[in-house]
Amino acid sequence: MQPYLDLMRQLLEHGTVKSDRTGTGTRSLFGHQMRFDLSKGFPLVTTKKLHLKSIIHELLWFLKGETNIAYLKDNGVRIWDEWATEDGELGPVYGRQWRAWPTPDGRHIDQISQVVEQIRTRPDSRRLIVSAWNVAELPDEGISPKDNARAGRMALAPCHTFFQFYVADGRLSCQLYQRSADVFLGVPFNIASYALLTLMVAQVTDLEPGDFVHTFGDVHLYSNHVEQAKEQLSREPYPLPKMHLNPEVKSLFDFRYEDFTLEGYQAHPHIKAPVAI
């Protein structure tokens, strides 16, 4: 995970001090890219322990097309609680856009099913893309996330905005464009989530995993995460673990939490840090 640590160090040393929506303040860079060869291990940060259960359940929740946090809460995942309404609604966030993008004529497009079929039938297509950036349903920046959700808009604008698959030599790669990235808390989750999605899609399309490429717009370190970042950078990373998927699963939507086994994950202790709301 050296590319991730190098990015955090670069933010500490060269980041531009900026204000932000939350009022916390950040050190920010614009335009950065990391690449992880998924054949060399699963890119899960080892310089602090991550809650893999949350990462897996959130991804499965996205793939279900759900936008209510009930499934997450039922499985002990609280990462979306701060932005949901009293009824657990978040508005048309990732799952809705991935699985049921609304069209002007009242239909809905299942982008995930569509892209899996395209990978199988047209692997050389340059349109193997899934987007969560639906301009018509973005939140009003003048009101709170909960009020946006109550009004039928997204509680939060998508941070991981769109992703593209690429097939070459029997290997499936994925590139994510992330417009906004919280490097200390969010990015380790995002890396693992999209790496896992790539493994899953590769399995159901009979391909080998290739690279996960992570491209950033505004990548930032919040001012109240600086000391935590320094502590993390003082630690020596461990070798990457391996992720095993149940080989019996043939449909992307049939994966369950029990179908994932992480082998050899050795990590330094968790580092607490506040979430910028």
UniProtKB/Swiss-Prot annotation:
Where would you find this protein in the cell? Cytoplasm
Q: Which family does it belong to?
A: Belongs to the thymidylate synthase family. Bacterial-type ThyA subfamily.
What are the protein's UniProt keywords? Cytoplasm, Methyltransferase, Nucleotide biosynthesis, Transferase
Give, as in the UniProt entry, the pathway in which the protein acts.
Answer: Pyrimidine metabolism; dTTP biosynthesis
Q: What does this protein do?
A: Catalyzes the reductive methylation of 2'-deoxyuridine-5'-monophosphate (dUMP) to 2'-deoxythymidine-5'-monophosphate (dTMP) while utilizing 5,10-methylenetetrahydrofolate (mTHF) as the methyl donor and reductant in the reaction, yielding dihydrofolate (DHF) as a by-product. This enzymatic reaction provides an intracellular de novo source of dTMP, an essential precursor for DNA biosynthesis.
This chain's protein is named Thymidylate synthase
Query: Which of the seven top EC classes does this enzyme belong to?
Result: transferase
Active-site positions on this chain: C159
Instruction: Provide the species name.
Output: Thioalkalivibrio sulfidiphilus (strain HL-EbGR7)
* Alphabetized NCBIfam families for the sequence: PRK01827.1-3 (NF002497), PRK01827.1-5 (NF002499), thym_sym (TIGR03284)
Listed GO cellular component terms? cytosol
Q: Where does dUMP bind?
A: R21, R126, R127, R179, S180, A181, D182, N190, H220, L221, Y222
Q: Give the EC number.
A: 2.1.1.45
Q: Which gene encodes it?
A: thyA
